């Protein structure tokens, strides 16, 4: 477009446009998707400016030829942003929640933590249950495994185990996801 600031530089992760295309020879495709052939970048820019549009680098062919399109770059970017927003709307975001327990947790405390985990699972969140070993408690790995199994039995009506319990440093971690209805 003519009203573009000539001193502005494109953002690094952005595709090259107009003068910022580095190739000397480019393959040009016009706004009607007609192949205009290989020509110099200067000629392609003149064609784009005569139509009051931008020269946009689409990609590079295996032989090294740069592929460009004559488009309204502002409109193209707007449509890309619109598509990405629409795609984001339709994504289901699963939130991760963590519940920490210890090997020698009391029965009532375990039930309270399980009730909280059920709430998280009903909201649709993924729950990470971390059993922390303190000091030399790591040698009682089977006791920790039993505690996690007891915890899972309390929440098994609303969740299913995604990953089995796995030792990670001083933590025994288990992941529970909501059951599909």
Swiss-Prot record:
GO molecular function terms listed in the Swiss-Prot or TrEMBL record: ribosome binding; translation initiation factor activity
One of the record's GO cellular component terms: membrane
A Pfam family that the UniProt record links to this protein: IF3_C
Main location, first listed in the record: cytoplasm
Keyword ATP-binding: no
Keywords: Cytoplasm, Initiation factor, Protein biosynthesis
Domain of life: Bacteria
Function: IF-3 binds to the 30S ribosomal subunit and shifts the equilibrium between 70S ribosomes and their 50S and 30S subunits in favor of the free subunits, thus enhancing the availability of 30S subunits on which protein synthesis initiation begins.
Protein name (database record): Translation initiation factor IF-3
Organism: Mycoplasma capricolum subsp. capricolum (strain California kid / ATCC 27343 / NCTC 10154)
Lineage of producing organism: Bacteria, Bacillati, Mycoplasmatota, Mollicutes, Mycoplasmataceae
